A protein has these predicted regions:
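Short beta-strand element of the alpha/beta-hydrolase
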Residues: 40-50
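Catalytic active-site module of serine/aspartate enzymes centered on a nucleophile-bearing elbow/loop
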Residues: 304-307, 311-330
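Alpha/beta-hydrolase-fold enzymes
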Residues: 133-225
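Catalytic nucleophile-loop/oxyanion-hole region of alpha/beta-hydrolase
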Residues: 55, 81-120, 311, 315-317
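Short beta-strand/loop motif that positions the catalytic acidic residue
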Residues: 266, 273-275
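The serine-hydrolase catalytic nucleophile loop
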Residues: 52-64, 78
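N-terminal cap/lid segment of alpha/beta-hydrolase-fold proteins
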Residues: 2-40, 310
C-alpha cells in the first residue's frame, strides 16, 4: 500500500532502497528517478526532514518534484524513525542524523547513473542543521539548501527566540538528569517533550503533550499550522509527530552538541536558506545566513509561514531550487 501523503506523479518511478550508516544502522529511503535516468550520469539530490516526519511526507514531495526536474532524488527516514533502523525508537541524535546524510551520499554516489561529483542536499525544518553540519565536513556535498530551518540544538537548549533564562536552563538540566535515573531504574525510556515550557510557577512542564482530537479555538498560529499538517492533510502512522512523543531524555544530546558550528566551512560551496515571511522560525535562517561565509543566499517567501514550505506548491520555490542546484552541481 502506498502511504505517501502528496500527489504522486505517475511518470516518476520510485524505488524503496536500503543502506547503512557508519554506525551500522540500516536506513530506508525512497529513490525517485527522472525519466531516461539510465541514459546518462545524473546530478543527485538528498532530502530529509522535517524533524519527526517521514519520507512519505514533505521530503518525499520535494524528492519527487526534483526528480521531475531531472535530478535523481532520495528522500530517507533518519535513524530511529519511520522505516529506518535503530533499536530505540522516537529518539534523535545530532551526530547520527548528520551521519545519516553522509551515508545517503555514500549510497547515491555509488549508483551507476549518478555523477558522484554532482550531489546536493536539501534539509527541511529540524533536519536543516544536520544538513549544513554534514556539508561543513563532507566535501562530497557540493551545494546545500535549507527550507524553514529549525536549529534543534539551539531550540532545545535555549528555547524559542532564546527565551530560557539561566535559571530555567538549570531546571531543565536537572529534570533531564533526574529523568535518566528514572529511566535507568525502570529499564524503559519515558516519553516527553523536546521543547519544554514552564508553568506559572516557573517550573518545567514535563508531562508528554497530549494532542487534542480537534484544534481548539484560538490556538497559537504556529501550533495550528503544525496540527493541520501532521494530524490532518499529511498525517502518517509512522511519523513521531503523529503517533507518539519523543523520548524524554532525547534533548540531552542536543544540549551537548551544537549544530552548525562548522557552517563557515561549507564555503566555497554555496548555501541557500529559504524561510517564510511569517514563519516563527525565520530567525534561524537569518542567523545562519549571518554566520555563513559566501557564497550564500537568503530567500524570504512572501506570505508563507513555517509549514507552508512543507507542502504548499504555490509557496515552495521549486524554480529557485532547480536553478540553484543546476548552477552549482556542474
Amino acid at each position: 500500500m502506498d502511504t505517501r501523503t502528496f500527489e504522486i506523479y505517475l511518470n516518476i518511478k520510485m524505488e524503496k532502497v536500503h543502506f547503512k550508516n557508519r554506525y551500522g544502522i540500516e536506513l530506508v529511503g525512497d529513490l525517485y528517478l527522472p525519466e531516461n535516468h539510465a541514459a546518462q550520469k545524473n546530478p543527485a539530490i538528498i532530502v530529509a526532514g522535517p524533524f519527526g516526519a517521514v519520507k512519505e511526507q514533505a521530503s518525499g514531495l520535494y524528492a519527487q518534484q526534483m526528480a521531475a526536474c531531472g535530478f535523481v532524488a532520495l528522500a530517507f527516514d533518519p535513524s530511529f524513525g519511520g522505516e529506518s533502523g535503530g533499536s530505540v525508537r522516537n529518539t534523535a541524535s545530532p551526530d547520527i542524523f548528520t551521519e545519516d546524510y553522509s551515508a545517503a551520499v555514500d549510497y547515491i554516489g555509488m549508483l551507476d547513473f549518478v555523477n558522484r561529483n554532482r550531489i546536493g542536499v536539501i534539509g527541511i525544518c529540524g533536519l536543516s542543521g544536520m544538513a549544513i553540519t554534514a556539508a561543513g565536513t563532507d566535501t562530497r556535498i557540493k551545494a546545500v539548501a535549507t527550507m524553514s530551518m529549525y536549529d534543534m540544538s539551539r531550540d532545545m537548549s535555549r528555547g524559542h527566540m532564546d527565551c530560557y533564562s539561566e535559571e530555567q536552563r538549570a531546571k531543565i538540566k536537572d529534570y533531564l538528569s533526574q529523568q535518566r535515573w528514572r529511566d535507568a531504574e525502570n529499564g524503559t525510556f519515558a516519553p516527553g517533550n523536546h521543547e519544554i515550557d514552564f508553568d506559572e510557577m516557573d517550573e518545567p512542564l514535563t508531562a508528554a503533550m497530549e494532542v487534542p482530537a480537534e484544534l481548539p479555538e484560538g490556538a497559537d498560529p504556529a501550533f495550528a499550522a503544525f496540527y493541520n499538517y501532521y494530524y490532518k492533510r499529511a498525517c502518517h502512522p509512522r511519523a513521531v509527530n503523529f503517533v507518539s512523543s519523543w523520548t524524554a531524555t532525547m534533548p540531552v544530546a542536543f544540549w551537548s552538541f551544537p549544530l552548525m558550528a562548522n557552517i563557515k566551512e561549507v564555503s566555497p560551496r554555496p548555501i541557500l536558506l529559504v524561510a517564510g515571511e511569517n514563519a516563527h522560525s525565520r530567525y534561524y535562517s537569518e542567523d545562519a545566513y549571518k554566520a555563513a561565509n559566501e557564497p550564500k543566499e537568503l530567500l524570504i517567501i512572501p506570505g508563507a509561514d513555517h509549514v507552508s514550505l512543507y507542502d504548499d506548491m504555490e509557496k515552495i520555490p521549486f524554480d529557485k531550487l532547480v536553478q540553484f542546484f543546476k548552477e552549482n552541481l556542474k
